[in-house]
Amino acid sequence: MELRPWLLWVVAAAGALVLLAAEARGQKIFTNTWAVHISGGPAVADSVARKHGFHNLGQIFGDYYHFWHRAVTKRSLSPHRPRHSRLQRVPQVKWLEQQVAKQRAKRDVYQEPTDPKFPQQWYLSGVTQRDLNVKEAWAQGFTGRGIVVSILDDGIEKNHPDLAGNYDPGASFDVNDQDPDPQPRYTQMNDNRHGTRCAGEVAAVANNGVCGVGVAYNARIGGVRMLDGEVTDAVEARSLGLNPNHIHIYSASWGPEDDGKTVDGPARLAEEAFFRGVSQGRGGLGSIFVWASGNGGREHDSCNCDGYTNSIYTLSISSATQFGNVPWYSEACSSTLATTYSSGNQNEKQIVTTDLRQKCTESHTGTSASAPLAAGIIALTLEANKNLTWRDMQHLVVQTSKPAHLNANDWATNGVGRKVSHSYGYGLLDAGAMVALAQNWTTVAPQRKCIIEILAEPKDIGKRLEVRKTVTACLGEPNHISRLEHVQARLTLSYNRRGDLAIHLISPMGTRSTLLAARPHDYSADGFNDWAFMTTHSWDEDPSGEWVLEIENTSEANNYGTLTKFTLVLYGTASEGLSAPPESSGCKTLTSSQACVVCEEGFSLHQKSCVQRCPPGFTPQVLDTHYSTENDVEIIRASVCTPCHASCATCQGPAPTDCLSCPSHASLDPVEQTCSRQSQSSRESRPQQPPPALRPEVEVEPRLRAGLASHLPEVLAGLSCLIIALIFGIVFLFLHRCSGFSFRGVKVYTMDRGLISYKGLPPEAWQEECPSDSEEDEGRGERTAFIKDQSAL
């Protein structure tokens, strides 16, 4: 009987070590949850779940549901085929997938927090113009009022004195524990401080004497607790799709491991959540997803291998240090759109924000700190013009970001004269410029997509491969593009050492984008399977002409591989070049920079010029506008061209019931004066990976050597785990014999005079045996129980 407790501990430890070793080798860890597509509504889903022993955790979105089974192992190296097969045979089940635990890393650079004090936030209003020009946006009257931001992370401390005044329960949920409370789980190391820190950057309350001030200090702030548990496709999708017609902006500072060898991105449900967000969120204007570009700089990682930052639906944000340098943790890639400030070297200041346990910190770091600053600036911009679409916001970022004060050796001028860098995108966000341009912004034309198959037959990569193709960008077709936004090079290739590859794409106007730089830690022989490398560097260029793809082996090794598929995907509009400003006349008051602020009678203000007729998509309205003088801000009542509602092509007012005509994809209701949208067409499913190309026999020997080398890390990981297990067993047996301590079936880790945190159980629960994993959690009112063990081991 005395041996039973430590035998159980050894078995449990061995199982945990096996799972850890499997994760280290990249093996899939299957959970006891399923994502299920069921037709018929929630009642049918509940009925199917009950009939087959599942518990319906709730709706992900649409007809997709999250099922859990108490009898299935919580973490397993193999899928549970019997349960899967039974559910698959149900007629109402259209699709299902047992969920796989994913590795997602929070993107902050760890440092011990310092004592709180009231700080100076140098990045909001600096004396040397090394700031984000936020004070100018505040001076124009924009503080984020009416805008809702949600932080997708490990929860937020909703009762923090600097957050409570702006907390929004409608923008919050605990996906990990399936309840509305996003309060983080407390630990001794404060592991779950990440979301609270990010929230304070966006919307910390102003003028209350606590900590600092958020960029959008009158915005509403919420949080989704989704990183403090198993992160699956369903968990990500539920988080990304939370309340999309209430939340305007989602800020995420996490992603796949920044280890320089991972290639990973959103799976089926998360990808669908992104698409639904931009097409249906905010009443059809599109949810805005702000993403941290990644902290893998020290590992020579590339954010183009991260399918979240590499997505056209996310606004990817990088970091700059206080002195305008590239931080040591920053990743360079062509999908980054812009930059905000964050931490740098030891002599450079960091970011001030709220911290866990109702504290304040001056040490928030990494691209984790950059993305929330961008979310705050976007909140100010949305307050200036709530009718901006998700693509309008990206255009505003491109047109107003500033390369000044940012140091890098890769600044280049693209085909339309804009400076762009793989480390900074188009430069630092400028809050003042963004809100000024947003107020009279013309909604961009509907997005077009032109797909061009480039490769006719597989090509050997060798030392260097160059693929050239002249395209007309779908000329003569309804999806013809003459003004670019995003460009994707979708590549399928095999290669015996993926990390040695460097890939570049050159546009017809000469802009050279690095789609992939060499990654020394990536020893994988998996290659890429229809991976969409994305670049923003050719924004506003004309895509017609010759495109060049370059793939090269950066090492001296005799590597080998084959490019089997190359699809060029162009996104943009049919507009001819950049829109010229309207002819200026009828101006009554000009600023020193020759921008009109007041028009004569009979004229309306449009993009700092006066026009007699507002352009299509705008309507004249008399509004209070903010005019910044040298020492003050004056409020002037003037006629301004304001945007029509996003559903209207032309209008007589800003409301959705003021439409006079509709876009081509919608029809006008002459009675209600509204435009009804046509349903979205379904997306094509991803093509299957082609079979591997046959190799000459002379290549068998190097391939075998590469295979043996690639398994060396797995062998070392296995041996390490075995040694750790032996040491653990010996030490545990010795301590057990010395202390005579008996566990009596209670699963509690103890340390001498240590505080042990355990989420969801009140203190009295420790006097009884722990409930099984299958039982319903109780006592949710107390989020953390601290147990102080007085026994000496």
Swiss-Prot record:
Gene that specifies this protein: Furin
Positions bound to substrate: 154, 191-192, 236, 253-258, 264, 292-295, 306, 308, 368
Domain comment, as recorded: Contains a cytoplasmic domain responsible for its TGN localization and recycling from the cell surface.
Species in which this protein is naturally found: Rattus norvegicus
Glycosylation sites: 387, 440, 553
One Gene Ontology cellular component annotation held by this UniProt entry: trans-Golgi network transport vesicle
Membrane topology: Single-pass type I membrane protein
Protein name: Furin
GO annotation, biological process: blastocyst formation; cytokine precursor processing; dibasic protein processing; negative regulation of low-density lipoprotein particle receptor catabolic process; negative regulation of transforming growth factor beta1 production; nerve growth factor production; peptide biosynthetic process; peptide hormone processing
Function: Ubiquitous endoprotease within constitutive secretory pathways capable of cleavage at the RX(K/R)R consensus motif. Mediates processing of TGFB1, an essential step in TGF-beta-1 activation. Converts through proteolytic cleavage the non-functional Brain natriuretic factor prohormone into its active hormone BNP(1-45). By mediating processing of accessory subunit ATP6AP1/Ac45 of the V-ATPase, regulates the acidification of dense-core secretory granules in islets of Langerhans cells.
Cleaved signal peptide residues: 1-26
Motif, Trans Golgi network signal: chain positions: 772-778
Residues reported in the UniProt entry to bind Ca(2+) 3: 258, 301, 331
